[in-house]
Amino acid sequence: MLQRFQELPTSEPPVRSHVARVLGSVALASSKAGQTERSRQEPRAALALDESIPEAYLVLGEYMFQGNDLAGALDTWEHGLRLNPENVALARRLERGRSEAQRLGGLERVTSEHFSIAFDGRADVPGARASLEVMEAAYRSVGALFELYPDGPIPVVLYPDRSYEQEGHVSWSAGVYDGKIRLPSAGANSTSLRFRGVLFHEYAHALFHRATGGKGGPAWVNEGYADVAKLVADPGPAVRCTPDVHSFQLRVLEQSFGRIGSHKQAHLAYLEARHAVEHLVDRHGQAGMKALFSELSTGAPFATAFERAFHEDYAAFATAFDAEAGR
């Protein structure tokens, strides 16, 4: 498509401007779909025709941001906003980027074959290197669960002066995955099973995002499968959720766990989500989970994707799962 646009006659300014706007819109769609290379090429092609296109600055800055080039992203958004001072999307994205820069302090990067880790170089070099080692192990082990091995570099951000103990469960505190794996760095130790388990869990979220084409799914599927991945690195004590301790209706766990009010309740929610996913894995295997992710990537409603992947009704599954608590 990009080549066809470039072949259009663009000597006339109105034509150039129109083609640039179309390319900007296409670039935005490519970025939302996770098409990394097109997210780099299309906005640059748009800006070559018309340097004022705001969508092109949004996408190009996001491409740099996801590559942990925070300074380049900020420069790109700032330039775009100077040319489009009334553009709300650019202003908001720039504000979020500046907030992240303040949290990270003196930004440095270390890279491996598959990951690029941004961190506060004044304090976090050992934590960054420990994280890099564990993430490469997760690439192999969690990748095997999803049968998914993305091309690198996959961006990771370590936040200084925050520990896993302070954060509780990282996913619960970190919020919605936005293309970067975000972790506190204090207590990073590549030999710690807990540390390894947290990173495996977080990498599973990144693969869930990619496996579903960015469409996502219910929180209990995302968090439950991530906890299955966590057990690969950190088996921990033999704690399994049993039906008598179900604390939530399964449909309640479709929404973000960030709404849950306490660490104890959050812990029970994660156990229950993992229990539900273990039911699915026991019945349908990893191939069934892969089929579910594939159906979700089409944008189908979850109940439809569930029925197509497992050939059973989601409402019936949820009702039976909830009924286990009363047995």
Name each model-derived stretch.
Residues M1-R4, H18, V22-A45, S52, ...:
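Beta/coil-rich, acidic/histidine-enriched accessory regions frequently appended to metallopeptidases
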Residues Q3-Q6, F65, L70-A89, L94-A101, ...:
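TPR/TPR-like (Sel1-like) alpha-helical repeat modules
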Residues P13-R16, A20, P54-E55, V88, ...:
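Helix-start (N-cap) detector for alpha-helical repeat units in TPR-like alpha-solenoids
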Residues G106-P218, A229-P237, H246-R259, A269, ...:
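Juxtacatalytic substrate-recognition/specificity segment
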Residues V142, S247-A315, G326:
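Active-site-proximal alpha-helical
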